[in-house]
Swiss-Prot record:
<feature type="binding site">
    <location>
        <position position="147"/>
    </location>
    <ligand>
        <name>[2Fe-2S] cluster</name>
    </ligand>
</feature>
<comment type="function">
    <text>Catalyzes the conversion of dethiobiotin (DTB) to biotin by the insertion of a sulfur atom into dethiobiotin via a radical-based mechanism.</text>
</comment>
<feature type="binding site">
    <location>
        <position position="207"/>
    </location>
    <ligand>
        <name>[2Fe-2S] cluster</name>
    </ligand>
</feature>
<dbReference type="InterPro" id="IPR010722">
    <property type="entry name" value="BATS_dom"/>
</dbReference>
<feature type="binding site">
    <location>
        <position position="277"/>
    </location>
    <ligand>
        <name>[2Fe-2S] cluster</name>
    </ligand>
</feature>
<comment type="subunit">
    <text>Homodimer.</text>
</comment>
<dbReference type="Pfam" id="PF04055">
    <property type="entry name" value="Radical_SAM"/>
</dbReference>
<dbReference type="InterPro" id="IPR002684">
    <property type="entry name" value="Biotin_synth/BioAB"/>
</dbReference>
<feature type="binding site">
    <location>
        <position position="70"/>
    </location>
    <ligand>
        <name>[4Fe-4S] cluster</name>
    </ligand>
</feature>
<feature type="binding site">
    <location>
        <position position="74"/>
    </location>
    <ligand>
        <name>[4Fe-4S] cluster</name>
    </ligand>
</feature>
<comment type="similarity">
    <text>Belongs to the radical SAM superfamily. Biotin synthase family.</text>
</comment>
<dbReference type="Pfam" id="PF06968">
    <property type="entry name" value="BATS"/>
</dbReference>
<feature type="domain" description="Radical SAM core">
    <location>
        <begin position="52"/>
        <end position="282"/>
    </location>
</feature>
<feature type="binding site">
    <location>
        <position position="77"/>
    </location>
    <ligand>
        <name>[4Fe-4S] cluster</name>
    </ligand>
</feature>
<dbReference type="InterPro" id="IPR013785">
    <property type="entry name" value="Aldolase_TIM"/>
</dbReference>
<keyword id="KW-0479">Metal-binding</keyword>
<keyword id="KW-0001">2Fe-2S</keyword>
Length: 332
């Protein structure tokens, strides 16, 4: 081993022992020369294997249950009312459409299904309809775990969703506390942070991640990763910006392939016990290196995203076959 490899191995040992990495140590991972990426991926894969010995990959699917007309001004998002983007706008879909979405998820082979709503926070009426849909999915006996992403939900709404059978709530920090003001002005990073704490307080599993390629620095990426370590979230979706025409970020810099692999590895080193999910932008940003990314992660989103199409599901099944990995099938 040379000097860099020895240093990376020392950080690997810290992760294996669940010792927190410092900000400087996490930055070191992001700043190594590209020639060390294969070694870095190897170590990240070993960390994953240590905490997740089963060679499994989970498929998760979503439904865009309420689309557009959002009151918030997130600069990356097609659904904000502030931007003219080519999307469909509609209110919360009926219960049967949410159930049909779960059926489609099962057909794709998804183990998780997330009901996603645009807007700062779901109304009481919307929460009620979601709980009806969740109960119906359970009554149908569909072999899929149900998650919800509906903004800054209060404790009462979270408890209702939990009672209905929801296992996990998604609410993304999106980026670091420091960079957040550059992408959103209609609410604060603290609003999102406190929502995650409420989710944990009521005993629901937490899913919270971010988007890379919005102009944030490596320090911002590390700060977000270390915040998730502090919060001990269960699942971290990793998204790479898909620039959308009409949004302020339609010409954002994006992320290069080697850079993306380093980001994924850094999240594995800093959050070794968390499920890492490859989500939006994985097709465009990982390209021929999808397999390397999957070695470090636990899950991937299939069947498309909120306003954009996803990868051909046949390619994801072939990827699992090539990696000799099993598709996770486990209903909580």
């Amino acid at each position: 081993m040379d000097k860099v490899e020895r240093r990376l191995y020392e950080l690997y040992e810290k992760a294996i022992n669940y010792e927190p990495l410092s900000k400087e140590e996490a930055l070191y991972i992001l700043e190594v020369d590209d020639i060390y990426v294969p070694f870095l991926v190897h170590l990240a894969q070993k960390i994953k294997k240590h905490y997740f010995p089963e060679n499994e990959v989970e498929f998760c699917s979503i439904i865009n249950a309420k689309s557009g007309a959002c009151s918030e001004d997130c600069k990356f998002c097609a659904q904000s009312k502030y931007y003219k983007t080519p999307i469909n706008v509609y209110n919360l879909v009926p219960v049967d459409e949410m159930v049909e979405g779960a059926i489609r998820g099962v057909e794709f082979g998804a183990n998780r299904y997330c009901i996603v709503l645009s807007g700062k926070s779901a109304t009481k009426e919307e929460v009620e309809r979601i709980t009806e849909a969740v109960k119906e999915i359970k009554n149908e006996g569909l072999p899929i775990n149900v998650c919800v992403s509906a903004g800054t939900l209060d404790e009462e709404s979270l408890k209702k969703l939990k009672e209905a059978g929801v296992k996990r709530i998604n609410h993304n920090l999106e980026t670091s506390r420091n960079f957040f003001k550059n992408i959103v002005t209609t609410h604060t990073w603290e609003d999102r942070y406190e929502t995650i704490k409420r989710i944990k307080k009521v005993g629901l599993s937490t899913c919270s991640g971010g988007i890379f390629g919005m102009g944030e620095s490596n320090e911002d990426r590390v700060d977000m990763a270390l915040t998730y370590r502090e919060l001990e979230v269960d699942s971290i979706p990793l998204n790479f910006l898909m620039p959308i025409e009409g949004t302020p970020m339609e010409n954002a810099p994006g992320v290069e392939v080697m850079e993306a692999l380093k980001i994924i590895a850094m999240f594995r080193f800093t959050n070794p016990k968390a499920e890492l999910r490859l989500c939006g932008g994985r097709e465009q940003n990982l390209r021929d290196f999808h397999g390397m990314a999957t070695l470090m992660t636990n899950a991937m989103m299939v069947g498309g995203y909120l306003t954009r199409a996803g990868r051909d599901i046949k390619k994801d099944y072939q990827l699992l076959k090539d990696l000799k990995a099993k598709r996770k099938v486990s209903v909580e």
